[in-house]
């Protein structure tokens, strides 16, 4: 059975893992306020969806 000839260094291990990252998918800017929101969801900041006021934010 094959055995590694040398121990993998921390730098080598870190360089190999540079592509193991999470990507944030489905984020768009709100057309009303410009804040980032999930696609096909109501904007949590202003309450707009598809150009319409769905949830009115009252103080």
UniProtKB/Swiss-Prot annotation:
InterPro entries: Ribosomal_bL32, Ribosomal_bL32_bact, Ribosomal_zn-bd. One of its GO terms (molecular function) is structural constituent of ribosome. One of its GO terms (biological process) is translation. Transmembrane segments: none annotated. Keywords: Ribonucleoprotein, Ribosomal protein. GO terms for cellular component: large ribosomal subunit. Belongs to the bacterial ribosomal protein bL32 family. This is Large ribosomal subunit protein bL32C. The gene is rpmF3.
């Amino acid at each position: 059975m094959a055995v590694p000839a040398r121990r993998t260094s921390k730098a080598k291990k870190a360089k190999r893992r540079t592509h193991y990252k999470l990507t944030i998918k489905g984020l768009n800017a709100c057309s009303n306020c410009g804040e980032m929101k999930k696609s096909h969801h109501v904007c949590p900041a202003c309450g707009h969806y598809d150009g319409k006021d769905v949830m009115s934010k009252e103080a």
